[in-house]
Amino acid sequence: MIRELCRGFGRYRRYLGRLRQNLRETQKFFRDIKCSHNHTCPSSPTSGGGAERGPAGDVAETGLQAGQLSCISFPPKEEKYLQQIVDCLPCILILGQDCNVKCQLLNLLLGVQVLPTTKLGSEESCKLRRLRFTYGTQTRVSLALPGQYELVHTLVAHQGNWETIPEEDLEVQENNEDAAHVLAELEVTMHHALLQEVDVVVAPCQGLRPTVDVLGDLVNDFLPVITYALHKDELSERDEQELQEIRKYFSFPVFFFKVPKLGSEITDSSTRRTESERSLLYRQLIDLGYLSSSHWNCGTPGQDTKAQSVLVEQSEKLRHLSTFSHQVLQTRLVDAAKALNLVHCHCLDIFINQAFDMQRDLQITPKRLEYTRKKENELYESLMNIANRKQEEMKDMIVETLNTMKEELLDDAANMEFKDVIVPENGEPVGTREIKCCIRQIQELIISRLNQAVANKLISSVDYLRESFVGTLERCLQSLEKSQDVSVHITSNYLKQILNAAYHVEVTFHSGSSVTRMLWEQIKQIIQRITWVSPPAITLEWKRKVAQEAIESLSASKLAKSICSQFRTRLNSSHEAFAASLRQLEAGHSGRLEKTEDLWLKVRKDHAPRLARLSLESRSLQDVLLHRKPKLGQELGRGQYGVVYLCDNWGGHFPCALKSVVPPDEKHWNDLALEFHYMRSLPKHERLVDLHGSVIDYNYGGGSSIAVLLIMERLHRDLYTGLKAGLTLETRLQIALDVVEGIRFLHSQGLVHRDIKLKNVLLDKQNRAKITDLGFCKPEAMMSGSIVGTPIHMAPELFTGKYDNSVDVYAFGILFWYICSGSVKLPEAFERCASKDHLWNNVRRGARPERLPVFDEECWQLMEACWDGDPLKRPLLGIVQPMLQGIMDRLCKSNSEQPNRGLDDST
């Protein structure tokens, strides 16, 4: 039992050390991110002076101010929780019905009679102090304040040799009034294997200090494995109250052990109670909520189940304490590893999402600026054409309007009611001031009607432009200016001025423009002509005559020319201001994009890989704690970066395949860690091989290297082996459909596989395909342009370092060639190549597989489209899939009716 306990606590310390190291590196990572962010971000505007700021300054200053990395931080709650776990070492805490039985259990655990087990006096008079047993090279006893200093006190044990600690040293003397002496614990150091791994604490007597207080002190510095020693057949009222208090304030499971009576022999297994004879103790513990009534909890818990309280009433089953302690310790470690891994994964997802955002920003911002410049020029030229073209139209329209509206205007003028002018009903003359007011109101009536017709004509053209392309232009500007302060959206304001030039003509036409002043001069001449020595009477005829004179004096050509001139002036002014502000905006974005690109590179090459490795370690720790290290079976195959073994059973999955990878350097570690994160983040899909978990083997190869063991679903064979063995046409086409479905799913998750080939397509026993080996799989935003993949399946643009997910379409085209050929023989164009370099050069120059006689025309066209040298001309997989389905329906149906002339079965 002692050996098993030592092994369990030693294992806990070992894994706790790894968790502590991972937490320390995680904290350092977040500190580095914070320092990097503080160094990158500009100072707050409030800290500087009132320097002049324009759009460029605002973009440069606020581009990273929102802080793409500011949200990457260690959540304080999780950090505190994890720090507390790694700081707490385990200890075995012994509670019990009385002090005698606690001492008995301690002696059983250590296998030596170190504490007296026969005490004089009752439990009520017992004053047993807290005892703490720790490891030391020599046996030594001392009094010390918990976690503080040792007290200078002469103990009975110091006066001579002893095998059992004297009772006087164990108890607090009644006449002792020294508070420190009362609180002090008796610290016993012993050279013992168990104490080398874990401290053992015996709780003080209940009368001296409540158990809840003792436990409360312990949990701040230790993880207690709680044992409760029993010697009676039932719990007393005091025992029940103590256990209720513990359950109320703490959630720790308890190992209840019934200590055999002194002098009695070990209970024979034949005398054990059956399930129907459950003890009173058991029923009491069920009532208290410690045990479950659903099963006979007799001290034989499963090795990997979550820790639960257990009652052991047979003394020979004390060995189950090792299983119980394993569960307690494992639960603690698994919960901590899971919490740490959640932090890692959450931040990694933020990194990847931000990498997408930054990549899109780098790609789309220059295009938006160019689009904005182009569309504004088109808008400006269109509006200038309107101004030039409309002058003659406006002149004709004014003449036509005056002719058609003349009678209506004269009638309206004759019948109009004047405002603020009292006109005598008997037709008596009025004063000169009233006459001028009446003439002005008639003039305003005519001008407003004419103005409305002109403005409507002009505005209809501008509205057409607004509806045609101005909306997109405005949205582009909003996205370019969104990082700026609302008050400095200068470029958008100038665009609005361009669009509103026609409306401004309408507003200023009768409120101060040169046209209005010209008309007012003409009206004054009319007044002079119709004003006699004595003021006239305001009659219907007089009003018609004033209106007639005003209409006849208007010059349609001058009016049209003035309107268009005013429109052009406003347009030119707004266009020039817009161009200047756009240049300023572009300069600001240029600085911001430079910083964004630097940050994007740092995320891809430093931050994300570093965090991914920590995530791999925390997840692997969780997996090894839950499922142990997998056992390697026979070797199934070897690849460029690892060996694949058979693994019969792991984590409830069987059979499994185990890929052992020994990363040779930091870069390969980072790539593997990111691959693992992408695979674990993917939802399960029937066309992708499941990844069950990972374990890091720190003693791989006899401790010479560290290996990552990836445990995944095991399938029947790969496509290469399947084609060699022979597959029917329908099976092969179904495999092609399965592969397309799998690639489409990866692309829908933002991932690019980059290594689609025969060996990376696995077949189950029904010959349905699943894609495996996501070693080169990455999100588009995280791709660095590295040249990866298998030469035969590599698209030409892979060699340039600038590529997207269409490289998987190219690779599928090559794969489809093999599927249609029904064999694994290399295409002639590739077989002639003497080396990889020779092959790559030929592919870049356009070398492709040849057409075989067995190929169906539609299949060949699909292959050619997929491996087109121009990525933009390759079909989307959403188009490829229905095409494949159509080919399969056509060929397989015809094949069932008559021999197929296009593709031969390879069986």
From Swiss-Prot:
Keyword annotations: ATP-binding, Cell junction, Cell membrane, Coiled coil, Cytoplasm, Kinase, Membrane, Nucleotide-binding, Serine/threonine-protein kinase, Transferase, Tyrosine-protein kinase
GO molecular function, one term: protein serine/threonine/tyrosine kinase activity
Residues in coiled coil: 373-409
Binding locations of ATP: 636-644, 659
Residue positions of the active site: 755
Domain Protein kinase: 630-884
Main localization (coarse): cytoplasm
Compartments, record wording: Cytoplasm; Cell membrane; Apical cell membrane; Basolateral cell membrane
Catalytic activity, reaction form: L-seryl-[protein] + ATP = O-phospho-L-seryl-[protein] + ADP + H(+); L-threonyl-[protein] + ATP = O-phospho-L-threonyl-[protein] + ADP + H(+); L-tyrosyl-[protein] + ATP = O-phospho-L-tyrosyl-[protein] + ADP + H(+)
EC number, UniProt record: 2.7.12.1
GO biological process: cellular response to fibroblast growth factor stimulus; negative regulation of apoptotic process; positive regulation of ERK1 and ERK2 cascade; positive regulation of fibroblast growth factor receptor signaling pathway; positive regulation of kinase activity
Main enzyme class: transferase
Similarity comment: family membership: Belongs to the protein kinase superfamily. Ser/Thr protein kinase family.
Function comment: Acts as a positive regulator of ERK phosphorylation downstream of fibroblast growth factor-receptor activation. Involved in the regulation of both caspase-dependent apoptosis and caspase-independent cell death. In the skin, it plays a predominant role in suppressing caspase-dependent apoptosis in response to UV stress in a range of dermal cell types.
Protein name, UniProt field: Dual serine/threonine and tyrosine protein kinase
Protein's organism: Macaca mulatta (Rhesus macaque)
Lineage: Eukaryota, Metazoa, Chordata, Craniata, Vertebrata
Primary gene name: DSTYK
